[in-house]
């Protein structure tokens, strides 16, 4: 039987279809606050793999309401992430995950412990979007600039307002966009995550980096690696990083009894 996981975050929807450990289909797209419509659209591409009944669960910060309305199983995203990590990288010591509007660290060695920032978009994908807009570049261009930096300027990342008051004077004084954009903005995200969430606990051993921002932005990956001084092979950026919660939701469904046809399930979402 196929297993479907749906992760609806603050800015994106992710859908995966699995058969055993094999991922048959996956999609990642922004929902622009049109959660129900975007989820149904994302499922259209999965239809070809769902000719028989399948099991499904929804996860994510914006998924609970839809799951409750549809009467579909919901799995908390930290638990879904844990499921994925145990399936693919079971020797992981810590997980750093950045989403559109939240950031979290999950410590796995020495007892499971989660630290999360969900009250402010500082140090998240939304912050990066805001800073790209301030610099009048796309997020892709911001990332490209970051890889060309020569120095790092300290800026705040607690929120876009404070960061803007740091960045604008730098630009006015002629600071290179590569230095401001990249390194400084991405370094601010790293500092916010490490300092704000670790709260003095060391991030060491094998660290798994998950979530869209940590998959798409190579400059952000670089800043985390250099800041944490992780040894060779200890910083892992998996190819499925942006789908980790959706994969975990799909894995979770293996223990469910309820199954649906494609028409039954999409009918519940409409």
Put a short name on every predicted segment.
Residues 1-20, 92-109, 151:
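Gly/Thr-rich phosphate-binding beta-strand-loop-beta motif of the actin/hexokinase/Hsp70
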Residues 62, 199-227, 238-242:
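Glycine-rich phosphate-binding loops at beta-strand->alpha-helix junctions
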Residues 19, 28-31, 46-79, 106-115:
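Short beta-strand-loop/turn "lid" adjacent to the catalytic site in phosphate-handling enzymes
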């Amino acid at each position: 039987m196929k297993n479907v996981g749906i992760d609806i975050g603050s800015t994106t929807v992710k859908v995966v279809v699995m058969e055993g450990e094999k991922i048959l289909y996956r999609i990642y797209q922004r929902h622009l606050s049109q959660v129900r419509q975007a989820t149904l659209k994302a499922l259209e591409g999965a239809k070809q793999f769902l000719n028989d009944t399948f099991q499904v669960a929804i996860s994510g910060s914006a998924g609970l309401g839809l799951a409750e309305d549809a009467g579909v199983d919901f799995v908390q995203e930290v638990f879904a992430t844990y499921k994925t990590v145990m399936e693919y990288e079971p020797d992981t010591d810590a997980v750093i995950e950045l989403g559109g509007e939240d950031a979290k660290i999950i410590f796995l060695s020495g007892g499971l412990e989660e630290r999360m920032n969900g009250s402010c978009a500082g140090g998240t994908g939304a912050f990066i979007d805001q800073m790209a807009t301030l610099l009048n570049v796309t997020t892709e261009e911001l990332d490209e600039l970051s890889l060309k930096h020569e120095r790092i300027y300290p800026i705040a990342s607690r929120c876009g307002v404070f960061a803007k008051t740091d960045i604008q004077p730098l630009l006015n004084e002629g600071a290179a966009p590569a230095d401001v954009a990249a390194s400084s903005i991405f370094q601010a995200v790293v500092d916010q995550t490490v300092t704000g969430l670790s709260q003095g606990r060391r991030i060491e051993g094998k660290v798994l980096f998950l979530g869209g921002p940590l998959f798409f932005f190579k400059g952000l990956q670089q800043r985390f690696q250099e800041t944490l001084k992780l040894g060779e092979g200890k910083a892992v950026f998996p190819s499925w990083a942006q789908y980790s919660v959706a994969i975990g939701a799909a894995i979770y469904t293996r223990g469910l009894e309820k199954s649906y046809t494609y028409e039954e399930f999409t009918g519940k979402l409409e």
